[in-house]
Amino acid sequence: MPSARDILQQGLDRLGSPEDLASRIDSTLLSPRATEEDVRNLVREASDYGFRCAVLTPVYTVKISGLAEKLGVKLCSVIGFPLGQAPLEVKLVEAQTVLEAGATELDVVPHLSLGPEAVYREVSGIVKLAKSYGAVVKVILEAPLWDDKTLSLLVDSSRRAGADIVKTSTGVYTKGGDPVTVFRLASLAKPLGMGVKASGGIRSGIDAVLAVGAGADIIGTSSAVKVLESFKSLV
């Protein structure tokens, strides 16, 4: 793994401007305390700052879809969040509901404890549905929980299932946005042609730069404006 200094420099080299960083940020609101007005404000911020998309729960994805369409903000909904331990049939209903409402991306939590082959079967079903809508599928792997061999198998299962991107963590149980975790996941996913989303504990511009330097293509954060504003002091 490169040194922290090298990772930081790589991140700065890849992020030429605040606009570059904004275009990589999935601005996220998944708090149980979130109100509809909170979500509306997040979508407005995503429009104002040019964030990549807004990541919401299924219920708010549906409720807010009209505003998002009006403002030109892409919506991503979590599926099976946060444990992933719902039957596939339930996840497919969730996915169908948000896709019909206009979501263009899904952040899916599979039932990881069932093992890589079960993850393959589950993600395959969700990908098949998502692709019929032209939607992007990201698979959340809770990378810090697994040894390298298991994580490699989970990444490969996601690829074989047709997912586009693997994501470090939900941010609920592990803080997967650190450069070590991102580098581990990117080292496995990038050779397979998959994108990498870093999420979990990214709250500053430095955090975002380190994640990108370690191999992240996308940054997931519930502190999107703070991250972007603090990044401006670095460039």
From Swiss-Prot:
SMART domains: DeoC. Keywords: Cytoplasm, Lyase, Schiff base. Extremely thermostable. Retains full activity upon heating at 100 degrees Celsius for 10 minutes and at 80 degrees Celsius for 60 minutes. It catalyses: 2-deoxy-D-ribose 5-phosphate = D-glyceraldehyde 3-phosphate + acetaldehyde. It is an enzyme of class 4 (lyase). Its EC number is 4.1.2.4. GO terms for cellular component: cytoplasm. One of its GO terms (biological process) is protein tetramerization. InterPro entries: Aldolase_TIM, DeoC, DeoC/FbaB/LacD_aldolase, DeoC_typeI. The active site is at D107, K167, K197. It comes from the Archaea. Optimum pH is 6.5. Is extremely stable over a wide pH range: upon heating at 50 degrees Celsius for 60 minutes, the enzyme does not lose activity at pH 4.5-11.0. The enzyme is also highly resistant to organic solvents such as ethanol, methanol, N,N-dimethylformamide, and Me(2)SO at 50 degrees Celsius. Loss of activity is not observed in the presence of these reagents even at a concentration as high as 40%. Catalyzes a reversible aldol reaction between acetaldehyde and D-glyceraldehyde 3-phosphate to generate 2-deoxy-D-ribose 5-phosphate. Belongs to the DeoC/FbaB aldolase family. DeoC type 1 subfamily. Homotetramer. This is Deoxyribose-phosphate aldolase. It comes from Aeropyrum pernix (strain ATCC 700893 / DSM 11879 / JCM 9820 / NBRC 100138 / K1).
